[in-house]
């Protein structure tokens, strides 16, 4: 009988960054949201996130790595959702 590996805890997350003229978002998946955010802010994350102080706008726990990657794909295409999160960020920082 084949043994299954235990499901890995996975999260999908949305980061935000804003200044007076621009608002940016970044969507990704990870096993540890806090550690991943620290990597992004230390300049060791994805190239597109380097040089900015990112804020966690949204995170969602997923049942598996595969599900997290699927949710990431969908969130990257849901611009209205990310725009709403960024508007909330701009309101908080104003």
What annotation goes with each model-predicted range?
Residues 1-55, 59-81, 87-94:
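GIY-YIG nuclease catalytic motif and its immediate N-terminal context
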